């Protein structure tokens, strides 16, 4: 850029447009930071760029298709563009819900230079907190905290040229599934609570790893007492010990609550392994012996079966 005040007044801009359409990819859809040059000359001082969020990768646990449209899976999108080095303006965050007529399409003018761009799709009831590009977190108005979440992050070198950036979001979460074999949930139970630690409620979209050591909680109101399946999510987190870097296991406390708020049944699942894009499934009779009983359960080996990337199965002991 020139140094004169006239040239400073004609600072080049970059137009960011996110559109759900197929286009020739000029950007590798990954969650690792890369710098991408975009190449069709346009009018001086303007840099229009189209970013197309056209699919999610890794979505195979409920369907056989490996790639699906973002609107089929997630109800919320957040796009965040971060300033170039030395710029004083704050990040620009644009949030959308599936109900928005323009879901998947946004426009924004930006300056020439290298910008970090992060895209997050999720099913939470609040927008993602994206102040730190390397630690995205989620709040909650109710009990929906960590939901199935997909990310893309990269660096785009905005020049006097234009092009299309195709974005395929990648799953960042692991799922824990409790599969009950009880004939029915006891009538006095009105809520099932999952309190778990060892995972993370925040994620680095560049590495897809959890960034915080979190205590997480999810609650399910029991309206159908024949319900068998309960699912919660976390961002797997690594810990270093004795020079080795290993995934942190979860400790999960599952508590049945009655209408008066009393805990009438509780089980503690210890040392539960979770991995990104995998389901860890625990199957068994949760209410064996009736209510008002507390049991600690330890888990050992894993059995793996392909479902997401795979399912790790445990049997709930009597």
Residues of each region from the PLM?
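Bacterial Sec-dependent N-terminal signal peptides
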Residues: 25-59, 178, 277, 282, ...
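Primarily secretory-pathway and cell-envelope proteins
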Residues: 31-77, 128-190, 194-196
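A structural detector for beta-sheet-dominated domains
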Residues: 52-54, 82, 95, 111, ...
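Generic recognition of cysteine residues
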Residues: 31, 74, 80, 84, ...
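Structured interaction patches on ligand/partner-binding surfaces of diverse proteins
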Residues: 33, 95-99, 124-164, 260-290
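Compositionally biased regions
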Residues: 5-6, 31, 136, 141, ...
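Sec-dependent bacterial lipoprotein signal peptides
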Residues: 1-30
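Tryptophan-paired
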Residues: 71-131, 188-278, 310-318
